[in-house]
A protein has these predicted regions:
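Non-globular targeting/processing and membrane-anchoring segments
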Residues: 1-3, 31-34, 50-59, 68, ...
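Residue-level detector of beta-strand face positions
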Residues: 62-64
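A glycine-rich, hydrophobic loop/mini-helix early in the fold
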Residues: 1-28
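Short, solvent-exposed secondary-structure capping/transition elements
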Residues: 18-19, 31-37
């Protein structure tokens, strides 16, 4: 990347998904000197959060790719990796809510995945920008 990109993350300290996702995002940012990371708390920035709702909800973490050269948003991602998003949707379709058993299952998935899906999601998200850069 030749253009400075800020990875703006909206999150909260209590977010279980963020605990799994943020270390991977940090490593991605470290790979390119034009990447920057900024973290803001959802509850302290309601106006910002309202611009990046997921199905009408304030789901976090939400990662916004802000292009500093064009002063524009290139993309946003979150609140979960693609595989985890499907797992959540499928479970909610069958059970209506995410119970403690599912939440444990999701954490086991995160541990086994070791950030691979997050990396692949971001490669897919960033690939068009790399080609155009």
């Amino acid at each position: 990347f030749k253009t400075p990109i800020t990875f703006l993350v909206i999150t909260e300290g209590w977010c279980g998904d963020a605990a799994q996702i943020l270390p991977v995002i940090q490593k991605i940012v470290e790979l390119n000197s034009n990447f920057n990371l900024k973290i803001v708390l959802r509850d302290e920035h309601p106006e910002l959060m309202s611009c990046f709702l997921t199905n009408g909800g304030k789901a976090i973490p939400k990662v916004i790719l802000y292009n500093e050269a064009t002063d524009s948003i290139d993309a946003d991602w979150g609140p979960r990796p693609s595989v985890a998003t499907k797992m959540v949707a499928d479970y909610k379709a069958l059970h209506g809510v995410l119970d403690p058993e599912f939440k444990e299952h999701l954490q086991v998935w995160y541990n086994k995945d070791k950030g691979e899906t997050i990396i692949n999601d971001f490669l897919t998200l960033l690939e068009p920008k790399i080609i155009l850069a």
